[in-house]
């Protein structure tokens, strides 16, 4: 017969109890995570998922939240996209009303739709020109700032702003650069 100490008996009892407590904590946290993701996504479908699916969904959601740069760019283009969508809906409505109006001249309909298309194209060109002007203005603001003097040991790539340093040759058009 094997002799067991009080410590060994205590460990035999304590280990399963600690495991149950750990699992209970994990389940509670998973339930909290489910409700948080459901609230933030506005989707109650996650509440009916099993634990593995819910964790996968939460990871995907967190990755989407992790990219603030993309979100900021989307937020900047959101009003323009909203306007474009509204404009196109209005153009479609005009087209539908003109097509359903008895006695409407086809030539008049074509000229109205051509005009609306030209206005839309002009608005897009204006927005692109405005974006380019903003980029140029930001570049000029950064290049006019006082730069710290470079030491001979430096790499030569020092800049106090995010935009690239102006090149020595004159540029006719601003070049788009991904940084």
Curated annotation (Swiss-Prot):
Listed result of changing residue 134 to N: In strain: NVIII-m19
UniProt KW Repressor keyword: yes
Domain Orange: 83-116
Pfam families xrefs: Hairy_orange (PF07527), HLH (PF00010)
Domain bHLH residue range list: 10-65
GO BP annotations listed: compound eye development; dendrite morphogenesis; mesoderm development; negative regulation of gene expression; regulation of neurogenesis; sensory organ precursor cell fate determination
Job of this protein: Participates in the control of cell fate choice by uncommitted neuroectodermal cells in the embryo. Transcriptional repressor. Binds DNA on N-box motifs: 5'-CACNAG-3'. Part of the Notch signaling pathway.
Keyword tRNA processing: no
Organism: Drosophila melanogaster (Fruit fly)
Molecular function, one GO term: protein heterodimerization activity
Subcellular compartments: Nucleus
Domain notes from UniProt: The orange domain and the basic helix-loop-helix motif mediate repression of specific transcriptional activators, such as basic helix-loop-helix protein dimers. The C-terminal WRPW motif is a transcriptional repression domain necessary for the interaction with Groucho, a transcriptional corepressor recruited to specific target DNA by Hairy-related proteins.
Residue window of motif WRPW motif: 176-179
InterPro entries in UniProt: bHLH_dom, HES_HEY, HLH_DNA-bd_sf, Orange_dom
Name of the gene this protein is made from: E(spl)m8-HLH
GO cellular component, one term: nucleus
Subunit (UniProt): Homodimer. Heterodimers with dpn. Transcription repression requires formation of a complex with a corepressor protein (Groucho).
Outcome after substituting residue 114 to I: In strain: NVIII-2, NVIII-5 and NVIII-m15
Protein name as annotated: Enhancer of split m8 protein
Main localisation: nucleus
Keyword field: Developmental protein, Differentiation, DNA-binding, Neurogenesis, Nucleus, Repressor, Transcription, Transcription regulation
């Amino acid at each position: 017969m094997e002799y067991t100490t009080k410590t060994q008996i205590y460990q035999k009892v304590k280990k399963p109890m600690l495991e149950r407590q750990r699992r209970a904590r994990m389940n509670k946290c998973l339930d909290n995570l489910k409700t948080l993701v459901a609230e933030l996504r506005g989707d109650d479908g996650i509440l009916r998922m099993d634990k593995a699916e819910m964790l996968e969904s939460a990871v995907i959601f967190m990755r989407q939240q992790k990219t603030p740069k993309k979100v900021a760019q989307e937020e900047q283009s959101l009003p323009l996209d909203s306007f474009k969508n509204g404009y196109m809906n209005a153009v479609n409505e005009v087209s539908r009303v003109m097509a359903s109006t008895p006695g409407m001249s086809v030539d008049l309909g074509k000229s109205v739709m051509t005009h609306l298309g030209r206005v839309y194209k002009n608005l897009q060109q204006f927005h692109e020109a405005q974006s380019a002007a903003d980029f140029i203005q930001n570049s000029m603001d950064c290049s006019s700032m006082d730069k710290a003097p470079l030491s001979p040991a430096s790499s030569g790539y020092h800049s106090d702003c995010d935009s690239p340093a102006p090149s020595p040759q004159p540029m006719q058009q601003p070049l788009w650069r991904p940084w």
